[in-house]
């Protein structure tokens, strides 16, 4: 009986696969190059674990960890990191980022969850540029999968 309950309670989690993640990184890198910008790009699975990453020549060293943390946060919280950042700026809308109890959580714009068939399958994050540029490039990667 216990075995049946365990099996009945399990749920399959969809994840973005490597080929999709690589396509996202390639498209974002191509657009950043077209704009003469350099950034770090991270694509994570539904759990926030890294699948694909690129740091363009000239991107700040700090952008490496920040991009990975943005992807991790967006996937785990199923929200854009900018939205999380807005809540921590205004305690009446949410709470301090330290509430999460994990230094990986970030509230800077540029991390966006990837939704497919009503479920988060991963996240795309960009770091190293202005917040608006990070968001715009990450959104380009999300649109690549959402539009397919």
Model-derived segments and spans:
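Flexible, solvent-exposed loop/hinge segments and secondary-structure transition points
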Residues: 9-148
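Short, Lys/Arg-enriched N-terminal segments with co-localized hydrophobic residues
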Residues: 1-9
């Amino acid at each position: 009986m216990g075995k049946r309950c365990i099996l009945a309670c399990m749920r399959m989690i969809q994840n973005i696969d490597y080929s999709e993640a690589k396509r996202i990184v390639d498209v974002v890198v191509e657009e950043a190059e077209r704009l003469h910008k350099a950034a770090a790009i991270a694509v994570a699975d539904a759990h926030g674990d890294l699948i694909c990453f690129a740091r363009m020549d000239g991107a700040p060293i700090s952008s490496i960890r920040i991009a990975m943390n943005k992807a991790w946060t967006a996937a785990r919280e199923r929200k854009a990191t900018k939205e999380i950042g807005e809540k921590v700026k205004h305690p009446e809308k949410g709470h301090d980022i330290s509430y999460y109890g994990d230094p990986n959580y970030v509230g800077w714009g540029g991390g966006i969850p990837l939704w497919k068939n009503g479920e988060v399958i991963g996240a795309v994050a960009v770091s190293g540029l202005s917040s608006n540029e990070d968001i715009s490039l990450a959104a380009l990667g999300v649109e690549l999968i959402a539009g397919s």
